């Protein structure tokens, strides 16, 4: 989407991450201009599982320009972490249903009350004019059921994920030539992602 915006004439900058997958905050701040309208950050790095401190990033961005819209891609975070969009100051948050065992193609967008959204699909004005077209009722119901199921005994499920992840990492580290990324004590990672490298094998 951002490359498409660039083709349409928008100025788009990409922020670097360090070896642990964390945003370079100094670079992010340096890229903010008077005419910056949007900052979009992935909540959880989908390759190594690093968790961004979204609340801190939002604060840093908004302290420079409170009118910047802050979006986070929470596809890998929703259901795996406790997310509080209002408390964290998030304006837009996107979620994909299949990551919590909902129907493929389903998802939702959290929109902060004062955020203005321009529809990309025009027509009948469904979904409060944000996305026209006949609603996919089975997918909507399936997503709802997936959310209800996923958040039943939620903390217990997350603890189980962390236990399985730790067990997997311990076993992997016993194999010669295997490297597990982002496992230092100062890196907070999601419970469901393990990044592994094998000596002698490139991408």
Where are these regions (language model features)?
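Pyridoxal 5′-phosphate
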Residues: 1-203
